[in-house]
Amino acid sequence: MADKDKPTTTYEKVARRLVNGQLQSALTLISKQCAMESRLYSIGEEADTLQKDYDRMLDFLAKGTHDPKLQEQHDILLERAWRLAESLYDAQVPAKLPFEEPILTLLERLLAEPDSDKLLNQIFEQLAESRQLTKAERKAMHQALLDENIPEYVRATLLSAITLHLTQSFDARMVEDLYTYTLDDQPVQLQMQAWITLVFVALIHTHRIEHLPRLREQYQFICESAPDLLFNLQIALLQCREAFTFDKKLHKIIDQDGEEEELSEQERVREFFEFITEGIDTTLSMFSHLKKISFFSAEGTRHHWFEPFCLEQPDIKAILDENPKALPWSRMLLQSVAQCNTDKYGSFLTMQAYNKDLMATISEKLEEKGMKFDDILPPSPLYVMRNYLHDLFRYCNMHPKGQTMRHPLFERDLDMSQNKWLSAGVSHPDQLKKTAEFLFRKERWDEACVTYATLLKHEVTEETMQKLYYSMSHSESSSDNRKALQTLIKCNVLFPGNKWTLRHLADAYHEAEEYQFEGQVLHEALEHHPDDPTLLMRLGRCLTCQDRIDEAIEILYKADIQKEGQLRVHRELANALFLTGDHTRAEKFIRMVLSRPEPSGDDFILGGHIALQGEDIPLALERYRKTDDYTYAYNGILSDKKKLIRAGIAENIIQLVMELLLRELYNEK
């Protein structure tokens, strides 16, 4: 084997053995690697289990057994081994530093291969780093931007990457290079894009830009031109890669090769619609990076920068409601849950920027097949853009001197009453409360967090703190989720004894696996509500997690007496009795749970565990099958394996049931 083909990582070595059919050798290698790294313990355990299954199959072969299903079982074992190897790869790759080609080399290669998306992506990712570029790298970038063979979308993407780079690490030399691109002797398109980038950097690094000698005279012009240029910047950033990708995809859909599998007209249109709604992440990765910058993550700016389109905004909703025959694709685009709001915004901009001839071609091709595709552009795009920009600048208040930026474009045809709740000037407690309640009802959790936090500075009430916690717990921001527990603890200190607060505080501790604190909170809640069956059930569950099974059963029986037939109490009782080995009583309660309408998959898995404890394998398999997903049942047994052994179930019985489920899973496929 040549040196360059020699496998270097554990995954490559395992994969080579699996390809050659050396299952035993591959499993041994996985086990050895997992034994050396404690973080791979769970993968090692699964490898040992797989090894035992393989040994058992070899024993059958050694006895001369010629079961035709042995080959199927071998294929299943091989598939499991591949999944195990992939898990090992996923666990090890993040710990290794990827090889990165120097940016100077990438730029030189880009001049030779201007249409290479791969090179462009690598340059974009490396420019996202905060380090300053060397003189040679800046020179190579200069050559790439001025090269006549570089397509416009590549130039726009490079400038977008430079913008991202400068927002994170101010580089005076790079900024001055940008200024040279704005001079009259440069191509018009490059002048415009460079000005846009310069304005964007100026808004973030105001205190640095105004002291650069070459830019001092232009600084006032930059400030005055910011609204229009920032508008162009967003279009450029969102379109630079997205339009090109759209173009390739559309041509593939419309001008399909006869050699490829022919799609029906309906499938073509459906594919086109799905493509629009799924979003183009390559362009918008810049916006994701910008969220890390303090300027854009500030409470007053982050919402409108990254969520410009939302059905709850009165102006956007009004556009769609104006015309009862609103465009199907635009409505679907706005209502799509698969796309973030900025993706939707970028898709609108891209479609608006499309060449009329291309739009006519799309319409003509689809009409030939009897499909109408009229009115491709969304209604009143300028109205949409005007409202978005008005809210953006009014909300961000980004003028260097602290004055709200105004522009004639923002003033035309605006119904200010629709946007009162968005105004940055809202400070009266009554107005804040109405705004917060509106955002809470519309489930705009990030904005609700900010508004409730502001409201607490004026007045501290139990309801406000509870709603702040609820908004934080539903927010996509991880920092808000971390603060949610602290907010709830503070609420409990200021307003002790509230059942809602104590219940949610206990749930938060349970999710964090802080069972001791959860127990303390539940005991406090029971002092105020001694006979509440829900609190008793939660306390029983908490005690079970702490291995205080006898106390848990006593509490759960008390809860069952308080509210006869409560489903969750019966489920927890069945689980606790199962752990004590009391199969008869556990079976009684699990039957009550499974007799209810639509029991969950977890209920059937627990029922299967209890049946196994009673050595009733057919009943256990019947219950596992009722999860309607053999993989889910198999994983449930695998994750509960220690629990099953602790409950007195023999390991060979567990293994047998898992093998039977795997066999049925394979037959089902």
What are these regions (language model features)?
Residues L455, K490-C491, E524-A525, K558-A559, ...:
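Canonical positions in the second alpha-helix
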Residues S38, V460, P496, P530, ...:
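Short coil turns that delineate tetratricopeptide repeat
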Residues L311-W500, H504-D507:
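Alpha-solenoid helical-repeat scaffolds
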Residues N20, K442, S475-S479, A512, ...:
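Structural motif corresponding to the intra-repeat A-B loop/turn of tetratricopeptide repeats
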Residues T8, Q193, D430, E463-K467, ...:
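Start-of-helix register in tetratricopeptide repeats
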